[in-house]
């Protein structure tokens, strides 16, 4: 009998420093496939730095990152990333279709022509987020929620195995939040790993399978239900924070 190896992400002894000091210290994480993971922590906890280190925007001073037992740095095409909205130049002159089509470059390379499959992937991704009707519209003409849907479509069109999203729910309406969670759950049903930086400690947090509590180091990594029933959130944010 043959077995398929789990799509597992491993982070071993990761430390990241900026000129003003250490941002992440001795990070050890193991994340199994088919999980929707939420990362929460106070401002300056290193949440965005962790994702940027995974995608190699930031170089650590120590540590290694593996995916399925092999160095992740050799598997960049398998990583999909949605940055914070504040990091995107929304005045850049590009339409919705072209933003999403850019996701296919990791699959086909910079100097290849887009295939029929690429066009089908982009169309399907825009349909999933209900944005196909805006395909010719410039991204700066969209609302905040619509812009976030476009970047989610780009993530889907890439067909990556490891999906990283930095505060995708900031500034979006309730309907867009529902769409995003629904599509992310579809991805984990396909045995992918989805990691989301999340700032809302309200009811939406229960959508995550597991939570990582981060404040420069790992405070806790456990099932969401266990963390919500513990005192670890109050330890991280202060005694005034609690979850039902």
Curated annotation (Swiss-Prot):
ATP binds at residues 41-48. The keyword Nucleotide-binding applies. Pfam families: ABC_tran. CDD domains: ABC_Metallic_Cations. The keyword Nucleotide-binding applies. It is found in: Plastid, Cyanelle. It comes from the Eukaryota. GO terms for molecular function: ATP binding; ATP hydrolysis activity. GO terms for cellular component: cyanelle. Keywords: ATP-binding, Cyanelle, Nucleotide-binding, Plastid, Transport. SMART domains: AAA. Its main location: plastid. Transmembrane segments: none annotated. Belongs to the ABC transporter superfamily. This is Probable ABC transporter ATP-binding protein in ycf23-apcF intergenic region. It comes from Cyanophora paradoxa.
């Amino acid at each position: 009998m043959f077995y398929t190896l789990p799509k597992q992400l491993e982070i071993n002894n990761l430390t990241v420093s900026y000129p003003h000091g250490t941002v992440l210290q001795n990070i050890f994480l193991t994340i199994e496939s088919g999980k929707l993971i939420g990362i929460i922590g106070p401002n300056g906890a290193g949440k965005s730095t962790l994702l940027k280190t995974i995608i190699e925007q930031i170089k650590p001073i120590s540590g290694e990152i593996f995916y399925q037992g092999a160095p992740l740095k050799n598997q960049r095409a398998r990583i999909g990333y949605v940055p914070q909205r504040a990091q995107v130049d929304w005045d850049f002159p590009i339409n919705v279709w072209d933003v999403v089509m850019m996701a296919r470059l990791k699959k086909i390379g910079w100097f290849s022509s887009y295939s029929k499959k690429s066009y089908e992937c982009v169309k399907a991704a825009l349909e999933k987020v209900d944005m196909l009707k805006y395909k010719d519209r410039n991204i700066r003409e969209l609302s905040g929620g619509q812009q976030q849907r476009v970047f989610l479509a780009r993530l889907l069109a890439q067909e990556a195995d490891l999906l990283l999203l930095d505060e995708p729910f900031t500034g979006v309406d309730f309907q867009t939040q529902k769409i995003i969670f629904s599509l992310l759950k579809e991805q984990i049903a396909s045995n992918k790993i989805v990691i989301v930086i999340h700032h809302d400690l309200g009811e939406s947090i229960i959508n995550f399978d597991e939570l990582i509590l981060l404040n420069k180091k790992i405070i806790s990594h456990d099932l969401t239900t266990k963390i919500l029933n513990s005192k670890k959130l109050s330890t991280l944010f202060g005694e005034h924070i609690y979850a039902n």
